[in-house]
Amino acid sequence: MATNKPANLNDLQKAINDISKDALKYLTDNKASVTTFHDQIGYAGYDAATLIGILKDKGGATLAQDVVKMIVMRYVRGTGFVKDVTKKTKATAGSEEAAALVARYGLVSSVGSNANAITLGRVAQLFPNVSFEVTKQFTGLKMAIDSSDLSMSGTDSLLWDFVPQYITLDSSSAPYCTTKSVAHILFSIHVIHAFLVTKKTMPEAKKKERGLLKDIDIIKYTTGLLVITCQSKNLNEAKKKSGRTKVCEPYCVNEKFKESFLALLASFGKNVVCSYGTQVKQFLAEQCSLMKTIVDNSSKTQDEMKALIIEFFEEE
């Protein structure tokens, strides 16, 4: 049992805030060494309180810098890097330090049946503000599914797996988003992104084991997980709003989305959302008002879709 486990929600939020603050300071003060670590390793529903406790128990005085390096590992090499590190027989630059982190925190490449398993992905999502700065600082980071796959080229920064931590839902049941908000747009995008990532990366044997044989099965599964993440109370509402603002800043003017971004959203709607079969589209229409608007107007041209989306966000 983790001896440093936060006792309540306030303590959990404070612990995340404190460690994030220290980790961000380390990232700012040690950009050169973090960049070196990045270069060395690079190629050309869990209980947050328990995980925080385990990290604090194992990390001690080096926890903040370790969090930064684990997050760098996650976004430079992916969650499977843990398995790569443990298989290495020949030491390379950065590998010994990465291996030490794997050993110290008992990092694993996938959760399996261990609810308290520590993966690079979980660390990154537990400290979204640190993850945001890491992904902002380094260029050329790869995604399994990027913005071009969503017909929204140039918006990769919206798709990182920590972004759902910033999303606030309007309802605890579908439709989850009904207001004309930034969170509504992020939720809509991540419903599709999570579906496509799982469809591409989950091994076929695991899909079969979980009964994820059709697109409708996969998207119901991934949307359920997304909703759980969005409902997380790891961050208070002020932190969530601040995170949304930071993530969306390149695409906004005076807290309103640029028309050029709404054009990309229309492209996403017409070329991706509307491309799915009837079952999937019907499911999507039930998840939020924006998806319903897109699905209900599947026959429209992309320009007509753009006009509808602009109107949708100007109604309130």
From Swiss-Prot:
It is found in: Virion; Host cytoplasm. Keywords: Capsid protein, Helical capsid protein, Host cytoplasm, RNA-binding, Viral nucleoprotein, Virion. It holds the Pfam family Tenui_N. RNA binds at residues 43, 46, 76, 122, 240. GO terms for cellular component: helical viral capsid; host cell cytoplasm; viral nucleocapsid. GO terms for molecular function: RNA binding. Belongs to the tenuiviruses nucleocapsid protein family. Encapsidates the genome, protecting it from nucleases. The encapsidated genomic RNA is termed the nucleocapsid (NC), and serves as template for viral transcription and replication. The N-terminus is involved in homooligomerization. This is Nucleoprotein. It comes from Maize stripe virus (MStV). The lineage of its organism: Viruses, Riboviria, Orthornavirae, Negarnaviricota, Polyploviricotina.
